[in-house]
């Protein structure tokens, strides 16, 4: 039985569910879950939690992501990416903008921004996914969502050809960010229709491309009984949370029994959630949270016996 976090390289054409389904067959275990959907046409890092690590999948999802995308100015599509039908076209030429214009524009997207999710997305409105409305040619008001663009920058020269302009960007962002919507919004600010023509996720939850394995590589390692060495411990998925190392055996026992604590029993300031780590084994004991009605207390959220 495997336990840990496995960074998978999801190839284009597969859904995130496809990856989990195939892994369950390869590893012969049902206790597998991914840490956030990647669209079928997007390649890149998809951390997968296996065994007891499935309990920390939400925390891996919260740790942020990084992408490399190609923005195409001059044509917009129904899906905001290269898979959709053309909505609008407007010829773009090198006289319209240059590298400096794009760099200044990208700076304006840094920080907390508002996005309207694309119609072809899994965001739910009135209990129904937006892509279900889109497939039925129904329109529905899409709620604006705040997302965090931690960093964004151009990583290629502008390529003007066939009345369009293409350039690559690198984006570091929080969860829930739609890069294809970012591409179309860049176009709006330039005064042109636009779409995202290619996307690769280069980092997710602290895992990067060089750590990621294809399904074929995973199958080979499993058959050679050497896959466990490639898995990251579940503690890795909690590195986005503050932690306290526990030495006292009595305190360890209380934590593992799920007892409440007063905040002032610990030297560290506890603002929201805290991870307790066994000082001897370096293993996680539990995740605690501030009590919802008693601010001076913390209570267990997840205990790892």
Swiss-Prot record:
Keywords on record: Isomerase, tRNA processing
Domain of life the protein comes from: Bacteria
Assigned EC number: 5.4.99.25
Reactions that this protein is recorded to catalyse: uridine(55) in tRNA = pseudouridine(55) in tRNA
Active site positions, chain numbering: 39 (nucleophile)
InterPro entries in the cross-refs: PsdUridine_synth_cat_dom_sf, PsdUridine_synth_N, tRNA_psdUridine_synth_TruB, TruB_C
GO terms, biological process: mRNA pseudouridine synthesis; tRNA pseudouridine synthesis
GO MF assignments: RNA binding; tRNA pseudouridine(55) synthase activity
First and last residue of the signal peptide: none
Any matching Pfam family: TruB_C_2
Family of this protein: Belongs to the pseudouridine synthase TruB family. Type 1 subfamily.
Known function: Responsible for synthesis of pseudouridine from uracil-55 in the psi GC loop of transfer RNAs.
Protein name (Swiss-Prot/TrEMBL): tRNA pseudouridine synthase B
Species name: Staphylococcus aureus (strain MRSA252)
């Amino acid at each position: 039985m495997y336990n840990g976090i496995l960074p998978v390289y999801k190839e284009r054409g597969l859904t995130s569910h496809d990856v989990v389904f195939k892994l369950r067959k390869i590893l012969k275990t049902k206790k597998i879950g991914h840490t956030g959907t990647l669209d079928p046409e997007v390649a890149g890092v998809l951390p997968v939690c296996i065994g007891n690590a499935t309990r920390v999948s939400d925390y891996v999802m919260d740790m942020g992501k990084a992408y490399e995308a190609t923005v195409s100015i001059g044509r917009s599509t129904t899906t905001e990416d290269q898979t959709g039908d053309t909505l609008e076209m407007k010829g773009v030429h090198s006289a319209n903008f240059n590298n400096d214009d794009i760099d200044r524009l990208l700076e304006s997207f840094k920080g907390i921004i508002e996005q309207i999710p694309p119609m072809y997305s899994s965001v739910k409105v009135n209990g129904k996914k937006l892509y279900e409305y889109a497939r039925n040619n129904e329109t529905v008001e899409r709620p604006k969502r705040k997302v965090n663009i931690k960093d964004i920058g151009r990583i290629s020269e502008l390529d003007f050809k066939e009345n369009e302009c293409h350039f690559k960007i690198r984006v570091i962002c929080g969860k829930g960010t739609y890069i294809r919507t970012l591409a179309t919004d860049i176009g709006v600010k330039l005064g042109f229709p636009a779409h995202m023509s290619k996307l690769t996720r280069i980092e997710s939850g602290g895992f990067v491309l060089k750590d990621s394995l294809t399904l074929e590589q995973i199958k080979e390692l499993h058959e050679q009984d050497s896959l466990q060495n490639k898995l990251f411990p579940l503690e890795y998925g909690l590195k986005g949370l503050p932690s306290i190392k526990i030495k006292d055996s009595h305190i360890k026992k209380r934590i593992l029994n799920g007892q409440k604590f007063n905040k002032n029993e610990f030297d560290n300031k506890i603002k929201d959630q805290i991870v307790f780590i066994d000082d001897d084994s370096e293993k996680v004991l539990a995740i605690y949270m501030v009590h919802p009605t008693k601010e001076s207390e913390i209570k267990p959220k997840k205990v790892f016996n």
